[in-house]
Amino acid sequence: MTKAYPALLSLLAVVALTAADKPAASGHAPVRDAAWMNERPADNKMVYSGQQLDTVGQLVDVPGRLLATEFAQGGKILLVKTTTVLASLDAATMKLIQKADFPIAKAGGSMHGLAVAADGASVVVSGGRTHLYRATVAADGKITWGASIDVSGGAKNVNPLGIALTADGQKAVVALSMTNQLALVDLVGGKVVTTVDVGVCPYGVALSGDGKTAYVSNFGGNAPGAEELAEPSGGTMVAVDKRTVALRGTLSFVAVGADSLRETGRLEVGLHPSEVLLDAPRQRLFVANVGGDSVSVIDTATRKLSRTLDTKPDHDLPWGMLTDGLALSADGRTLFAANAGINAVACLDLSAAHSAPKLIPAGWYPGAVRVRDGQLFVVNVRNGVQKVALPTDAKTVADYDARARAAAHLAHALRYAKGPRTTTATAAPVPVPAEVGQPSSIRHVVYIIKENRTFDQVLGDIGRGNAEPKLVLFPRDVTPNHHAIAERWPLLDNYYCNGVNSSDGHAWASQGIVGPYREKDRVGFRCAYDFGTDALFFAGCGFIWDHALLHGRSFRNYGEMDKLTKLKGKTYDDFFTDRQNGGGKTAFTTAFTIDALRRYSCPGYPGWEMAIPDQTRADVFLQDLAAMEKRGSFPDLTIIYLPNDHTAGELTAKSYVADNDLALGRVIEGLSKSRFWKDMAIFVNEDDPQTGGDHVDGHRSFCLVVSPYAKKGALVSKFYNQTSVLHTICRILGMPPMNQVVAASTTMEDCFTTQADLTPYVCLTPKQKLNEKRPPAAKKTGFWPPFPVGDDRLTAQFEALDFSGPDRIDDDTLNRAIWAQTRPGERYPREFMGAHGKGLKALGLRLDPEAADDDDDE
């Protein structure tokens, strides 16, 4: 036994490694991106974040995003709540018994909320919008649904989350996250007895042993004070800091009577508090702080904060553990915390005053944990339920800890989180310095974010690298600039988007991490879909521009996260024609919910609005660039949003993409002919791939790297993703990485050389018309709609698509439409659409088993 880990080592017998721990039979070598990645075990699997999965124990697949877990029938049955079903498993064998679809399928399950009564059979589940689902679990694990209970009080969406049941199982206290209330629900009568206001977005709930006190975590803290900054979330204003990140988290104490609720106190805890866990015998309450990388420990007798536990295995690691689920050992000495940000469970020794937690490797994105009979059960949001025997010998403890650290690249992250390791005076400038703070030959970074294309859709016909011409939708005639840029500078054919739609895609592109508030809320609609409009969605690390400003860098934004552009009854054709005629007859207004971004944004640059051509966006930027040329100053970091490759319904898909291509070419040409070109790097990528077609996988996309220092004509097949871009930007600008996931990502040295070529880029004009309209009577011609002639149902589905915001559409319908337009008469290759993973295995990468479920836009 080791002194550093007494609580865990005293639990039970030695862990027995299952087949899941043995080397993979495929024989494929891991992708070797850099020296630090060469050291990982050959059986590890890489996920899109660049992290490895080295899961120990058994892992059982359950469909959907996995959200919560509890035991039933005296611990014999393990229940797992997902976005779509309540699943039951034999806790001993981990055999999946049943997947019971929720009674209200369209509502699904909310991101939290599953409770089992003391009888071990009665179950209550929080639905996605307005209802609680009641069920009975038999001794054999079979689930039978009972009557659902409407807890909405007439509201459209209250989004119930945490649930706690009274000892007799007759009543429940339920967090109503959208109305900021705690409800007392009569489960027998099937009605809400009363409600009480608590903090913003109540999340987790626990009930004292006597049933007289409820403890409620408020994910958004208290309502903002009169002098505090505030931004919206779910119809409620949230107190925020200057970055528009939530200012605080709180815990409410609520007195519970037979038919009454009364808030009796409130205590500040960590940021984004989620699950609460009551240890009644020891008068302790644990609160997981997703945004605080910590667990708050409350003395329930005094109602005061007794200590804060750091869930980082090393205090110097960057922010980003994303601590969510909690469980306590039977002896009360070890707290288990699900660290979703590093795919591990942290084991915290509560008997030690200060002790760094040891780690147990989990699956992808652990979100809930439970402990019973010496076994740890982990619900991994992205890839299944895990069962592992808790280790009792020092060797296994050390092995698990080392494996979890290696899989999450913690040593790599720690190295770069600590800042400069050598003096800048002794290092020669290079494009991507080896260490934080060393000089870069690049001074200005331009980051261009576009919408929704895979690698094969655009570059499948490029004639080199891992490309598939049979899947290209927008060939050289449509995208001559994309092709020319990828041919002149590096072609990256192993690059991936971390997200699956614009909601999490823009988060990955600008924050490099996504918390459980979004990862778990796939059908519950607590988290706003439009990224940039929900303050509780924003990660504790802030955005890349916050990071740059914090480190004294200058910044300018063109359109990113301006989701509220308003038009005055104008169409794409109106803007296109007005621009050709000299302008002045069309107008729009912009608006931002992120105050810090508003202050650094070009007021005349439109954000999301498919009726505005990307040519207009290029015009505005180039005018601004000309003014900066005269002033002789250009920002250290510039973000430009060019969204029209998303496509919409007014024009043909090729016209939208050609418009986007020409705008990109014009921007690149303008920058390359400017006085700032000599020390500039431009990164161009998509926010997400929109489950499009690609022969490797639907997450594979393209990244264009443009610079005098970018390698000419190089083929770069190393694994990169959106967090690689962010880490590279940070390194170039002399900043430490902004969070744990970014810190663990590879930087993109292989795309650059030390020899500059200042030759400017010359924009090419697409052969495709930029304003080719979709024929209104196309159903009769077969050209449009893109479905079999006479299929009015699918035609109606396309006509009903909502293009008012990014990805508010059914991906399959739009993808079928684009395919039929661009490759008329050819069979739709459904097998290569979305997250199919057919080409990942050969690259040492892993398919998310639940990715197909993720790809559906809400």
Tell me the role of every PLM-derived stretch.
Residues P6-A16:
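Bacterial N-terminal signal peptides
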